[in-house]
From Swiss-Prot:
Covalent link location (5-imidazolinone (Ala-Gly)): 211-213
Modified residues (2,3-didehydroalanine (Ser)): 212
Species lineage: Eukaryota, Viridiplantae, Streptophyta, Embryophyta, Tracheophyta
Protein name according to UniProt: Phenylalanine ammonia-lyase 1
Organism field: Arabidopsis thaliana
Annotated catalysed reactions: L-phenylalanine = (E)-cinnamate + NH4(+)
Length: 725
């Protein structure tokens, strides 16, 4: 065990003494300046969350996981849990002596007649019973704990996902390697062989309260090791295996294990199933939280938002590190953004007629996401401590020649961390839903079409309407899942386990929440890309309309019937202002319709000029009113064709104005969705449904392919806000 970083194996021993500020006892080293470990816990929180996520990803991608008992990481657990991954596990040979020393101690103490829980006694509330048949006791332990239900129907599965089982196996090996559990090293090698050969025991999905550890599910790993006839496993190609077939495929030639005293208890009395699944959940949650930060910034881009919401002073005055980092990341994405430059020009037009600030879903996104990131980060560190902890009972202290009866099997850090993480996930999902709802609503989205429809005929295209309904469903379920699990504890096992952590149940519910957040992230990301493309189309259509209006104005309004300069020539500048101010998608499907605002406002410009033309209006030659009919007729003859030509050029990828997203730091994410995954602009004119495109992105997120383009968006970020000048 260690606190200051210098490991002392259980087999050694030195007298208690002070040395270099540390307190050394027979089996541990305690930092005298941090005896309660608060300082070490705080030290782990230094640096940015993004850097921590990058480290997780780097660990996830390493080809080998070296286990020694105290350095296992969330990223490594996630890597091993991934089905089909080629990552291998290697055990530290230096741990062998300590592991075997504790195993030998158990045998020696039993032979001496020492009374130890689970070695010579019954279990739990029946620990008053005694036996000298330690081997038979371990066999009975595994038998009665095999109480899970798998079911035989095809439509429902009551089997723990294989990924979670692999995570549990890895964590259990790691915790047993520290040499306080009384189990042979050979058993840990056998579990490692199962992992390295992609052989996964079948564990029940339910049936554990994660105190005393995950007894029921872990007993099925022990059942496979001992060759119980009811034990099952799945091979590398998904084939069902018996215990005998599993041993053969794993290359374990020693045969089934006859568990020695304490070994069955060592295998089952730990929190590995709950903490293993929690590790998987937190790896994905950390990635999705960074994605939410980036999407909030891109949301600001496509909404033509005001970037001052990321100003460093605002967040420095609030002091919360999660908020400061979230704002700094968004600030980095928006810094130099071509969309923000365009938005600034837009906001400078008629500023007194527009809202002074954006709505909360945009403007307070750093304040909203920051606390969630802090919660997720603390939960990550808590679970990382848990997977490197010794979690069974009793603990074998060879150096003091005693078995210590305690309660490290209580998985409260898992239950609490997972409940908190689930709340954070629900909050991220709620923000995403609020942002999505603004994006698809033409009353809020600064000129984008309702439902992000992209067809020429909006009456036959309802865009993301179905997706918005689905998002409401996702968000509702996510908020329901945010309810705590740990407040539903029941007294168990004859009131011996009268408080219990429900760690795995909470981990399972959090895993469900992560899946739903992935659905929401997928839908929102595709909608963001749709909005990017609609902004691109909007810019090309607006320029086309401006050019056409300018040409028609020059042709019709510049001169009179005799070629003389006409007073109406001064209308052109104001006509172009109308085009700049009018939202393109309010008229794009029929630009010359008298019921649409473009023609109405262009006509009003000419009328206003006529009203100030004074006496000249009485003369038909100089009258501006007389020009209105000719102007509109010429516009109707030309504009629809030009707008259709601009749309056709856009569809063919030959637009005159390139897509602004290519000039933005958020471009790698857009490129990934559009080019690498092959999604396209959704319209009612095409057969492709939104769900088909969502599936492509969802699969990519589940496979971790979103990580690289996401990180590429932040490659240039230096880990700090932009300096205040």
């Amino acid at each position: 065990m260690e606190i200051n970083g210098a490991h002392k194996s259980n087999g050694g021993g030195v007298d208690a003494m002070l040395c270099g500020g540390d307190i050394k006892t027979k089996n541990m080293v305690i930092n005298a300046e941090d005896p309660l470990n608060w300082g070490a816990a705080a030290e782990q929180m230094k640096g940015s969350h993004l850097d921590e996520v990058k480290r997780m990803v780097a660990e996830f991608r390493k080809p080998v996981v070296n286990l020694g008992g105290e350095t296992l990481t969330i990223g490594q657990v996630a890597a091993i849990s991934t089905i089909g991954n080629s990552v291998k596990v290697e055990l530290s040979e230096t741990a062998r002596a300590g592991v075997n020393a504790s195993s030998d101690w158990v045998m020696e103490s039993m032979n001496k007649g020492t009374d130890s829980y689970g070695v010579t006694t019954g279990f739990g509330a029946t620990s008053h019973r005694r036996t000298k048949n330690g081997v038979a006791l371990q066999k009975e332990l595994i038998r009665f704990l095999n109480a899970g239900i798998f079911g035989s129907t095809k439509e429902t599965s009551h089997t723990l996902p294989h990924s979670a089982t692999r995570a549990a196996m890895l964590v259990r090996i790691n915790t047993l390697l520290q040499g306080f559990s009384g189990i042979r090293f050979e058993i840990l090698e056998a579990i490692t062989s199962f992992l390295n050969n992609n052989i996964t025991p079948s564990l029940p999905l339910r049936g554990t309260i994660t105190a005393s550890g995950d007894l029921v599910p872990l007993s099925y790993i022990a059942g496979l090791l001992t060759g119980r006839p009811n034990s099952k496993a799945t091979g590398p190609n998904g084939e069902a295996l018996t215990a005998e077939e599993a041993f053969k495929l794993a290359g374990i030639s020693s045969g089934f294990f006859d568990l020695q005293p304490k070994e069955g208890l060592a295998l089952v009395n730990g929190t590995a199933v709950g903490s293993g699944m929690a590790s998987m959940v937190l790896f994905e949650t950390n990635v999705l939280s960074v994605l939410a930060e980036i999407l909030s910034a891109v949301f600001a881009e496509v909404m033509s938002g005001k970037p001052e919401f990321t100003d460093h002073l605002t967040h420095r005055l609030k002091h919360h590190p999660g908020q400061i980092e979230a704002a700094a990341i968004m600030e980095h994405i928006l810094d130099g953004s071509s969309y923000m430059k365009l938005a600034q020009k837009l906001h400078e037009m008629d500023p007194l007629q527009k809202p002074k600030q954006d709505r909360y879903a945009l403007r307070t996104s750093p304040q909203w996401l920051g606390p969630q990131i802090e919660v997720i980060r603390y939960a990550t560190k808590s679970i990382e401590r848990e997977i490197n902890s010794v979690n069974d009972n009793p603990l074998i202290d060879v150096s003091r020649n005693k078995a210590i009866h305690g309660g490290n099997f209580q998985g409260t850090p898992i239950g609490v961390s997972m409940d908190n993480t689930r709340l954070a996930i629900a909050a991220i999902g709620k923000l995403m839903f609020a942002q999505f709802s603004e994006l698809v609503n033409d009353f809020y989205n600064n000129g984008l079409p309702s439902n992000l429809t992209a067809s020429r005929n909006p009456s036959l295209d309802y865009g993301f309407k179905g997706a918005e309904i689905a998002m409401a469903s996702y968000c509702s379920e996510l908020q329901y899942l945010a309810n705590p699990v740990t407040s539903h504890v029941q007294s168990a096992e004859q009131h011996n386990q009268d408080v219990n952590s429900l760690g795995l149940i909470s981990s399972r519910k959090t895993s469900e929440a992560v899946d739903i957040l992935k659905l929401m992230s997928t839908t929102f990301l595709v909608a963001i890309c749709q909005a990017v493309d609609l902004r691109h189309l909007e810019e090309n259509l607006r320029q086309t309309v401006k050019n056409t209006v300018s040409q028609v104005a020059k042709k019709v309004l510049t001169t009179g019937v005799n070629g003389e300069l006409h007073p109406s020539r001064f209308c052109e500048k104001d006509l172009l202002k109308v085009v700049d101010r009018e939202q393109v998608y309010t008229y794009a499907d029929d630009p010359c319709s008298a019921t649409y605002p473009l023609i109405q406002k262009l006509r009003q410009v000419i009328v206003d000029h006529a009203l100030i033309n004074g006496e000249s209006e009485k003369n038909a030659v100089t009258s501006i009113f007389h020009k209105i009919g000719a102007f509109e007729e010429e516009l109707k003859a030309v504009l629809p064709k030009e707008v259709e030509a601009a749309r056709a050029a856009y569809d063919n990828g030959t637009s005159a104005i390139p897509n602004r997203i290519k000039e933005c730091r958020s471009y790698p994410l857009y490129r990934f969705v559009r080019e690498e995954l092959g999604t396209e602009l959704l319209t009612g004119e095409k057969v492709t449904s939104p769900g088909e495109e969502f599936d492509k992105v969802f699969t990519a997120i589940c496979e971790g392919k979103i990580i690289d383009p996401m990180m590429e968006c932040l490659n240039e970020w230096n880990g700090a806000p932009i300096p205040i000048c």
